[in-house]
C-alpha cells in the first residue's frame, strides 16, 4: 500500500466555485471532514452566500485580484483557501445589498481596485442597476485574447509552479 495519501485539492470557477462552497459551509472543518487539503476558487458569483463563506474562511484564506499579488513569503500556517476574484468583476461584486448599502469596493475616499471605473460612485438603487447591466457583459471575450478583466480569468490562472507553491 501507499505510505501517504494523495493530497486532494478543490478547484472551481464561477458557478462551480459556488457549488463547492455550498457543499462545505463550515469551511475548514468541512475540508477536514472530507479529507481536502486546500482549495482555489475563481470568480465566485457574489451574493449573501459568498459574503458568509468569505467570513467563515477569513482566518485561513487569501483573496487576490491577480497572481502578482501572491506574497513572496506565504503566511504560516499556509492558507488553505485561495480566492481569485477580479476587483472589477461584476459577477463577483453583484449582490442584493447593493440596493441599499455601499460596497467595500466603492469606498468614499475614491480608491479603487484594478478595473473598477474611477468615476463610479455608490448611489442607492443606481449602483445595483449598473452592476446588474455590467454582469451581462462581464464575459464578453474575444477568442484567443486572454485579458485580465471582468469575469474572464484565463490570463490569471496560476501555472503549475505557482499552484504547487500555494497549495
What are these regions (language model features)?
Residues 1-6, 26-167:
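C-terminal His-loop and adjacent cap/lid subdomain of alpha/beta-hydrolase
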Residues 10-17:
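Gly/Ala-rich beta-loop-alpha elbow adjacent to hydrolase catalytic centers
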Residues 17-29:
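Short glycine-enriched nucleophile-adjacent loop
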Amino acid at each position: 500500500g501507499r505510505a501517504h495519501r494523495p493530497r486532494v485539492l478543490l478547484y472551481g470557477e464561477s458557478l462551480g466555485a459556488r457549488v463547492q462552497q455550498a457543499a462545505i459551509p463550515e469551511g475548514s472543518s468541512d475540508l477536514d471532514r472530507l479529507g481536502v487539503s486546500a482549495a482555489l476558487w475563481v470568480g465566485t458569483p457574489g451574493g449573501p452566500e459568498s459574503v458568509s463563506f468569505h467570513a467563515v474562511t477569513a482566518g485561513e484564506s487569501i483573496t487576490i485580484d491577480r497572481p502578482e499579488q501572491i506574497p513572496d513569503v506565504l503566511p504560516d500556517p499556509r492558507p488553505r483557501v485561495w480566492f481569485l476574484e477580479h476587483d472589477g468583476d461584476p459577477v463577483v461584486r453583484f449582490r442584493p445589498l447593493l440596493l441599499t448599502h455601499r460596497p467595500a469596493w466603492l469606498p468614499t475616499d475614491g480608491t479603487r481596485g484594478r478595473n473598477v471605473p474611477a468615476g463610479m460612485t455608490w448611489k442607492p438603487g443606481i449602483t445595483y442597476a449598473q452592476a446588474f447591466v455590467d454582469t451581462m457583459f462581464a464575459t464578453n471575450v474575444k477568442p484567443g485574447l486572454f485579458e485580465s478583466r471582468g469575469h474572464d480569468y484565463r490570463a490569471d490562472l496560476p501555472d503549475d509552479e505557482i499552484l504547487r507553491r500555494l497549495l
